[in-house]
């Protein structure tokens, strides 16, 4: 997959578009978003990550960049991070079932465990002709109830929920993965942590009346 790894920032319109043109986020149950969120609900900055579990650039971000952002911003109460499924079905045949697995895991409060396992073993399941059995084994490794998981995966509402998220992402302007909405701006690409730091520091300062300079630790 040759995803675009360029910076695309549209400050001032992105978040409005996300909330008004993508009713998915307003309609999604708070409990569903909470199970796919990290950080305090009262954090001054909210980031919506739109991602595809079969996207290699999303894997890179999840493993190389996100841990540092979590340490600096999420665990310190500055940022709330919300994961939104945006499967690129024309490129990744297993992106939809992987996304469905994550939604079902979220119902058992196991979203982030499955999130990490899907990216960790992406190179194993991505080339498979049928990834379903492997996904079930990942869910078992995450400690999920197999009975509840299978029932959720068979439920037509799970596919509808995933499709609604993808449609909402498209209406909001996302066209590649990973993509991020940061309090009014759209950022696209698995960019270096320094790019995120510059933006998050500036947005946090604007929201709290502080400075945009964070001491390096």
Kindly give the residue locations of the regions a language model identified.
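N-terminal secretory signal peptides that target proteins for export/translocation
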Residues: 1-7
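C-terminal cap of thioredoxin/glutaredoxin-like
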Residues: 3, 50-52, 63-66, 136-217
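Bacterial N-terminal signal peptides
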Residues: 8-23
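Boundary at the C-terminal end of the N-terminal hydrophobic targeting segment
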Residues: 24-28
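A short beta-strand-turn-helix
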Residues: 29-45, 73
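Structural alpha/beta surface segment adjacent to cysteine/selenocysteine redox centers
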Residues: 43, 51-140, 172, 206-217
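Envelope-exposed proteins and targeting segments
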Residues: 43-46, 77, 176, 183
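Divalent metal-coordination and catalytic microenvironments
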Residues: 47, 114, 149
